């Protein structure tokens, strides 16, 4: 099985969600990632993946793989903040590489 690590940025974002249904749906998708079945996603440049959650404003979770047994959850957002969230995810990946 895969180990999932949350960045502090991701953890703060998820804890800040007020919509309990949205939070529950996101957590279900994270558990699916844990068993290597992420569902609807796309791969972005730099090894970052975008998980799409079709609920509410279109939530997104950005993550990357580190070796074959670790997933790092980078940050989250929704369709309206997508461009900024991708840039933030790229920045977090760079920090983890340093």
Predicted regions span which residues?
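A residue-level signal for beta-strand positions that form part of recognition/binding surfaces
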Residues: 1-3, 48
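Enriched for short, Lys/Arg-rich terminal
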Residues: 3-4, 12, 20-23, 38, ...
């Amino acid at each position: 099985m895969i180990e999932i690590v949350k960045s502090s940025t991701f953890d703060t974002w998820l804890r800040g969600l007020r919509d309990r249904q949205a939070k529950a749906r996101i957590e279900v998708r994270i558990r699916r990632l844990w068993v290597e079945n992420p569902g609807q996603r796309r791969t972005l440049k730099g090894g970052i993946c975008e998980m799409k959650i079709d609920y509410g404003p279109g939530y997104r979770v950005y993550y990357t793989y580190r070796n074959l047994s670790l997933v790092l959850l980078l940050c989250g957002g929704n369709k309206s903040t997508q461009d900024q969230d991708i840039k933030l995810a790229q920045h977090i990946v760079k920090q983890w590489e340093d």
